[in-house]
Amino acid sequence: MSKTVTGPDGKCRCAWCDAAPEFNAYHDTEWGFPVIDDQRLFEKICLEGFQSGLSWRTILAKRENFRAAFADFDFRKLAKFDEKDVERLLQDAGIIRHRGKIEASINNAKRACEMVEREGSLAAYFWRFEPDPSEIAIPQTKSTSPTSVALSKDLKKRGWKFVGPTTVFAFMQAMGLINDHAEGCFLRPKIDEVRKSLVRPG
């Protein structure tokens, strides 16, 4: 059984909120709420790629800097970035200066444009991979799933980079493709209700 922690407001939250004070707001207003906006979906999968090998606290602290540096994750604009932009970004101390991850985000922006042409939207594509709830029987006990493995494989086949199964699973958790809030977390039933009323794209 996954654990919860009781915050200063008396609410039970997922235990990972205890790792940093800024996590409470992120947990309460973003994590796990279903997202069908293409730009937000693209931003999140890029930031999950940047997180690889690092903590989410590091990425969250730099998120506004990332948005400023990466054209607010408008993938149509980011797809036009060139080698000069890569070199500029490598000098930006406000972000994670990792050439491979920077180049992957630009590459993925181009692949996102292609995906919209083929699929209609990023949301229509990603939500096709919404798993059956039974796949995650006990919340927060897995770092990958059969669906995250399948989605990762398909993205790589389409030319996306830094989209391994663990990265993709974290993306699915955060974007509400699954409800992975802990049993006992005050938000778990709310997320269930939001997911029930969500009109799936595509």
Kindly give the residue locations of the regions a language model identified.
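HhH-family (HhH-GPD) DNA N-glycosylase catalytic core used in base-excision repair
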Residues: 1-202
